[in-house]
Amino acid sequence: MSLSTEKKAAIVAEFGRDAKDTGSSEVQIALLTAQINHLQAHFAEHKKDHHGRRGLLRMVSRRRKLLDYLKRTDLALYQSTIARLGLRR
C-alpha cells in the first residue's frame, strides 16, 4: 500500500528544497511518516496482518535512523521537521 503520486509530490513540495528534491532527509522522513500513518489505519482493521506489520516496523526503524542522523547534523532542521510532522520525539 504505497502513496499516490500526487500525495508524494505534495509532500516533496512541502518539505523539499525544490520540486525534485526527493533525497533530503526531511523529505524521506515525511514520506515515511505518511506511509506509516497509512499503515496504522490499515492495521486497525487487519489485526492479523503480521507480514505487513514487519514492513511497518522496518519503516519506523528507518525513520528513526533518519531522524537521529538529522538531529546529529542539523538540530534546527530536525526540530522544525518534527514540529511540522507532529512527531513526539
From Swiss-Prot:
GO cellular component assignments: cytosolic small ribosomal subunit
NCBIfam families assigned: S15_bact
Alphabetical list of InterPro entries matching this protein: Ribosomal_uS15 (IPR000589), Ribosomal_uS15_bac-type (IPR005290), uS15_NS1_RNA-bd_sf (IPR009068)
Gene that encodes the chain: rpsO
Keywords: Ribonucleoprotein, Ribosomal protein, RNA-binding, rRNA-binding
Assembly notes: Part of the 30S ribosomal subunit. Forms a bridge to the 50S subunit in the 70S ribosome, contacting the 23S rRNA.
Protein name: Small ribosomal subunit protein uS15
Chain segments annotated as coiled-coil in the UniProt record: none
GO-annotated molecular function: rRNA binding; structural constituent of ribosome
Family recorded in the similarity comment: Belongs to the universal ribosomal protein uS15 family.
Function, as annotated: One of the primary rRNA binding proteins, it binds directly to 16S rRNA where it helps nucleate assembly of the platform of the 30S subunit by binding and bridging several RNA helices of the 16S rRNA. Forms an intersubunit bridge (bridge B4) with the 23S rRNA of the 50S subunit in the ribosome.
Keyword Ribosomal protein annotated: yes
Any one of the GO BP annotations: translation
